[in-house]
Amino acid sequence: MTRSEKVEIIAKLEEGFKASEAIVVCNYRGLSTKKLEELRNNARENNVKVQIVKNTLANIALNNSGKTGLVLKDTNIYLWGEDQLGVSKVAAKFEENNDKFEIKTAHIEGEVADVAKVKALAKMPSRNELLAMLLQVWNAPITNFTIGLNALKNKKESE
């Protein structure tokens, strides 16, 4: 790889890392190409970027984008995106289904996070699920009131 190619890779990573709310670093050693393609497809559906990069290049891009503190060793695959829940869910779900895939560390909301935090975020409901729950709570009193009025109307009609 030439120096200009490395500079280009660093620039693309830096741009992606700056725009991201979450970066998850995982070990992928031993995964087949088919499994990696499955991970990429899942990530693409959730607007999550996935890339395997040399640690030295990733470290430079992370430091340039202000995401410091991650210790990068061995083989790593990087997942990042604007939605921290989406990134966490993709990584945690894939780890559940694949023994050879392991979440190592993460950088979420400006600070280094451990595996437990990533898994905790993955269990949280998404924004759309939370909005649906909120709408259910708001609609419940109106629905119950309407049911009560209909029951009263039916009772009056039957008399």
Swiss-Prot record:
Gene that this polypeptide is encoded by: rplJ
Superkingdom of this protein's organism: Bacteria
InterPro entries named in the record: Ribosomal_uL10 (IPR001790), Ribosomal_uL10-like_sf (IPR043141), Ribosomal_uL10_bac (IPR022973), Ribosomal_uL10_bac_type (IPR047865), Ribosomal_uL10_CS_bac (IPR002363)
Function in brief: Forms part of the ribosomal stalk, playing a central role in the interaction of the ribosome with GTP-bound translation factors.
Family, as annotated: Belongs to the universal ribosomal protein uL10 family.
Protein name from the UniProt record: Large ribosomal subunit protein uL10
Signal peptide stretch: none
Molecular-function GO terms, alphabetical: large ribosomal subunit rRNA binding; structural constituent of ribosome
Record's keyword annotation contains rRNA-binding: yes
A single BP term in Gene Ontology: translation
A cellular-component GO term for this protein: large ribosomal subunit
One Pfam family from the record: Ribosomal_L10
Keyword Cell inner membrane attached: no
Keywords per UniProt: Ribonucleoprotein, Ribosomal protein, RNA-binding, rRNA-binding
Family annotation (SUPFAM superfamilies): Ribosomal protein L10-like
Quaternary state and interactors: Part of the ribosomal stalk of the 50S ribosomal subunit. The N-terminus interacts with L11 and the large rRNA to form the base of the stalk. The C-terminus forms an elongated spine to which L12 dimers bind in a sequential fashion forming a multimeric L10(L12)X complex.
